[in-house]
């Protein structure tokens, strides 16, 4: 069935409890590549509890995951994550319980050929005192659901890559088993466990992407400072 604008805009949950342990945060860090060099204290702090375990800021994307749009009527096989962002109010603790408010924030009809854009906002606060922890936003592109008659909305500006050199470049090699390590962070699915044969005849794990992190060989992260 086609998606319904009024129904989508009414979707929200309040105070959903999300509990996580230090085992969860540690496993996430291993899954995205930390711990390749156990002698590096900067890596060890994210994968060993005796080192004063820290939580990666990007773990917020996992804590914000939910089933809010599971039955919204879109053609799920043609849905892709368009963009996401996280704003931290304070560091995420290594273990704890959060109360998360989620809602569909935006819905725009880009036309039958372009699809629909659906934005979800998740705001998390600590259960014990209500202090804000983070706000996560995701925009989904439902490629098969455009032309449903909803408002087009204002088109967001494209992200333009800077032409100058990055402030910092840190290339790192992804372990061959990293996709397998990352799977249990989200769910045990076949994705990320299938093997593919590369052009040179070598067999390797298929690239796996979830929770805002792409796991693939020879990845390089570039961060702009300031």
Question: Where are the regions a protein language model picked out?
Answer:
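HotDog/MaoC-like acyl-thioester-processing domains
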Residues: 1-14, 79-170
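Hot-dog-fold acyl-thioester-processing enzymes
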Residues: 1-81, 150-153, 160-226
């Amino acid at each position: 069935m086609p998606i319904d604008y009024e129904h989508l805009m009414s979707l929200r949950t309040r105070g959903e409890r999300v509990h996580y342990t230090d085992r969860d945060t540690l496993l996430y860090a291993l899954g995205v590549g930390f711990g390749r060099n156990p002698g590096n204290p900067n890596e060890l702090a994210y994968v060993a509890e005796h080192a004063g375990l820290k939580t990666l800021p990007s773990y917020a994307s996992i804590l914000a995951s939910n089933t809010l749009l599971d039955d919204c009527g879109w053609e799920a096989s043609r849905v892709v994550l368009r963009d996401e962002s996280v704003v931290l109010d304070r560091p995420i603790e290594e273990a704890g319980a959060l109360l998360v408010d989620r809602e569909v924030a935006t819905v725009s009809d880009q036309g039958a050929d372009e699809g629909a854009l659906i934005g979800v906002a998740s705001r998390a606060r600590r259960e014990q005192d209500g202090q804000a922890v983070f706000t996560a936003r995701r925009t989904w592109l439902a490629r098969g659901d455009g032309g449903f008659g909803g408002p087009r909305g204002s088109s967001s500006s494209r992200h333009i890559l800077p032409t100058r050199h990055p402030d910092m470049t840190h290339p790192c090699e992804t372990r061959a088993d990293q996709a397998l390590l990352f799977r249990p962070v989200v769910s045990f699915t076949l994705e990320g466990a299938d093997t593919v044969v590369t052009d040179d005849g070598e067999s390797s794990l298929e690239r796996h992407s979830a929770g805002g992190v792409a796991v693939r060989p020879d990845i390089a992260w570039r961060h702009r400072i300031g």
